[in-house]
Amino acid sequence: MILSEAILNCKNYIDTEEIIHLIFAKRNNGKFLPDSEALVLELTPEEMEMQLSIIAETKCPGFEYFLEFFVLQDFYDDLLKIEEFKSDDKKVGRIIYYAEFDA
């Protein structure tokens, strides 16, 4: 899966009391990009207490934490209301920027 697919399909992942969904992705030349390789991890609340870097090292070496799905879904919903972000490319770009610099 690539990062843009994970972002645009964010509504397909529903967190529960037992499972929390997170995206981990690989950087290309030091940056997250729409075509960066991405993984969706399902973690238990106990696993969420671990440092994210340790989760990445043990469950997906070479990948870095990107965002939790509940954060992504809230931000995605907000973007749907803004005319400037109607295209998928604009939504993906803004979410990547948010994950890199604002989250």
Where are these regions (language model features)?
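Extended, charge-biased low-complexity segments
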Residues: 1-55
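Amphipathic protein-protein interaction modules
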Residues: 39-100
